[in-house]
Each structure stands twice: as structure tokens, then as C-alpha cells.
């Protein structure tokens, strides 16, 4: 079974949580695209939902699938966000942003009552850091921002390499918000919450790809079946899978 087939299976399980009248955050990336396509088929069958896309790419996909869309300014809350992840640890902390949409993804996730992460089982890791950590930055003063990032990494005992992400044209990749992305190749992040806190206070950083405490549950698809992992706080509150 291909990775693409596994992603679609995970998306189908997440779709079971969608109810008529919900306001949904629509993630970005190859896995989230499967969810958007499956959701679109349900909408064509009469399901009534409103989606808030996390990128212009997702907006185009959702429009193509006939999903009614809104902005966060036009809805008072989001019931659920469904999105993928580049890495997931056992505490359901995430690395996201490989597709470059981390800022809007985090804003939408934080505005949601629940966040379901969908992925194939290769994304579950013991410790975050194997996948490069995306850090969205302001172009102005980039050298100073890089030095501050390096200092934060040193405080956490991490010796990493920072690389400015380039687009297909060979120039700096530009996010939907007009920013650049520095990918931090770290190998291992021993204390993700601590690093997230240090990065969050650096002037010049718009947002980083560590999603701490935002995922309510994770749907992992493997050749052996579906595994659902819930964040302990969600289990304690009786939140349904």
C-alpha cells in the first residue's frame, strides 16, 4: 500500500468526525489535500459546512471541490481543524510547515475547538527534529535573526544548521504572508516546548513550525490498519475519537 493510499485512509477516518453545520479549518499539504477532496465529495452530497483554508493552495483546492469558504474574520469560531504534519512525537507535539503554510496553519489551529492530525505512520517519531524545523522570518535583518536562532539552539544544547529555503525559481521561497523561511536542520530536539518558547520571543521570527499542545488527536494509517492517539488532556475530558 502506497504512502498516498495511507494518507487517504487517515483522511477518511478524520472525515467521520465532521458533522452538518460545522466550521472547519482546512490544512495544507499532500495529506490535508486528501481530506479536502473527500470533504468536497460529501458537500456535493448535501453536507453543509464552511471551511477556512490555511493557504492559497488549499483555498484553490477547496473551491475546485465546491466547499463553501470563509475567513477567520467571518466566523466566530472553528469547530475542528484537520491538517497533516511533518513529524509527530508521543506527546502529540508536531513539526509542521514543510509546505510553507505554518503561520496560517497555527493561527487556524489555535482558533479551533479541536485539531485532528492525519498522517501515515512514518510521521510518528520518538523525538522531533529529524525533519528540518521551518522558521518563518521577516527578510529585514535576517543575519541578526539567524544569530538569535543559533543562540536559542545553543541554550537547548542543539548544534544545528540553518538554511534559507529557496523556491523553484532558485530565489528565496516567499510565504503567503510575504515572509521567508529558514529551515533548521537539527537532527534532534530534546525539549521541544523549551525551544518553542525561546524561538517565540525572537524579534524577526514571525512563527515557527513547533506546534505544542495544539493537536487533540492523531489519526495514523499503516499497512496494518488505523491507529488513533489522543492527547492525554483530551482523553481526561472525555473527548470522543
Swiss-Prot record:
Gene that this polypeptide is encoded by: rpiA
Name used for this protein in its record: Ribose-5-phosphate isomerase A
One Pfam family it belongs to: Rib_5-P_isom_A
Disulfide bonds, paired cysteine numbers: none
Catalytic activity: aldehydo-D-ribose 5-phosphate = D-ribulose 5-phosphate
Record flagged with keyword Isomerase: yes
Pathway assigned to this chain's UniProt record: Carbohydrate degradation; pentose phosphate pathway; D-ribose 5-phosphate from D-ribulose 5-phosphate (non-oxidative stage): step 1/1
EC number(s) on file: 5.3.1.6
Top-tier EC class: isomerase
Domain of life the protein comes from: Bacteria
Similarity comment text for this entry: Belongs to the ribose 5-phosphate isomerase family.
Active site: 105
Function summary: Catalyzes the reversible conversion of ribose-5-phosphate to ribulose 5-phosphate.
Keyword entries, A-Z: Isomerase
UniProt record, GO biological process: pentose-phosphate shunt, non-oxidative branch
Protein residues bound to substrate: 28-31, 83-86, 96-99, 123
PANTHER family in alphabetical order: RIBOSE-5-PHOSPHATE ISOMERASE 3, CHLOROPLASTIC-RELATED
Gene3D superfamilies: 3.30.70.260, 3.40.50.1360
InterPro entries according to UniProt: NagB/RpiA_transferase-like, Ribose-5P_isomerase, Ribose5P_isomerase_typA_subgr, Ribose5P_isomerase_type_A
Subunit structure: Homodimer.
GO MF annotations in UniProt: ribose-5-phosphate isomerase activity
Amino acid at each position: 500500500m502506497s504512502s498516498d493510499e495511507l494518507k487517504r485512509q487517515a483522511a477518511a477516518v478524520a472525515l467521520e468526525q465532521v458533522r452538518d453545520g460545522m466550521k472547519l479549518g482546512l490544512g495544507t499539504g499532500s495529506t490535508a489535500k486528501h481530506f479536502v477532496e473527500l470533504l468536497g465529495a460529501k458537500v456535493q452530497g448535501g453536507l453543509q459546512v464552511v471551511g477556512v483554508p490555511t493557504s492559497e493552495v488549499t483555498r484553490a483546492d477547496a473551491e475546485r471541490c465546491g466547499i463553501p469558504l470563509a475567513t477567520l474574520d467571518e466566523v466566530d469560531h472553528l469547530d475542528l481543524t484537520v491538517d497533516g504534519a511533518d513529524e509527530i512525537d508521543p506527546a502529540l507535539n508536531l513539526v509542521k510547515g514543510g509546505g510553507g503554510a505554518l503561520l496560517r496553519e497555527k493561527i487556524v489551529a489555535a482558533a479551533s475547538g479541536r485539531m485532528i492530525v492525519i498522517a501515515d505512520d512514518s510521521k510518528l517519531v520518538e523525538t522531533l527534529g529529524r525533519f528540518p524545523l521551518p522558521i518563518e522570518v521577516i527578510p529585514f535583518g535576517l543575519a541578526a535573526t539567524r544569530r538569535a536562532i543559533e543562540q536559542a539552539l545553543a541554550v537547548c544544547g542543539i548544534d544545528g544548521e540553518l538554511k534559507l529555503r529557496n523556491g523553484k525559481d532558485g530565489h528565496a521561497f516567499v510565504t503567503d504572508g510575504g515572509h521567508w523561511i529558514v529551515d533548521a536542520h537539527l537532527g534532534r530536539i530534546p525539549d521541544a516546548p523549551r525551544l518553542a518558547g525561546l524561538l517565540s520571543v525572537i524579534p524577526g521570527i514571525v512563527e515557527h513550525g513547533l506546534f505544542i499542545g495544539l493537536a487533540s488527536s492523531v489519526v495514523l494509517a499503516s499497512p496494518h490498519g488505523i491507529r488513533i492517539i489522543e492527547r492525554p488532556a483530551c482523553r481526561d475530558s472525555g473527548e470522543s475519537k
